[in-house]
């Protein structure tokens, strides 16, 4: 297992426990949260991303990715369930690190952040799943927008709400340029060529979450933008054939694929 245990167990074991109060599901969720917490580097205040992958010989023990923001609710939940503040503390410290190195001033994001695992010092921002280093992978934007909104939900810390808004406004501005259809990378030279429906779905979900935490004058912008994205994606990507399992087509793993 690796950093994505939050994606995996929040939507399975934790969700089942919340609905059915199944004790085994609670145990599985807490076990997953403990595994995730075990990936925390206290010096750099980050949760390590991948285990050593086969596609690089470079040491990745200092690699952090924007996707990790979506794993933090598992830690927040575990802290509330157990009363152990260490879970939530790790989540907050990791979110602060992502805020410091992953979210740019204009609301765009870096996919990968490389830190020195011994000192916590910043080293690099590799390309990741986007077009290039310094570009703007759209699904990564979703993870920032949605993830910071969720961190605000659990902590009430305004800096996380502000971070979510920055990412949201960046996404809205870029999506409106292309009829609300999500391209793989908002800064790629082939801006209108490659799409990623999954980025659109995730951005819309993040906008709807964000709308729950703002006043009525702001809420409308996020709600209406989410609906525009969903309608655009439904028109271009959705397959309603009952003979086939998949509904949303047009997903893209990474730009260079």
Where is each model-derived feature located?
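Glycan-recognition and catalytic cores of secretory/periplasmic carbohydrate-active enzymes
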Residues: 1-257
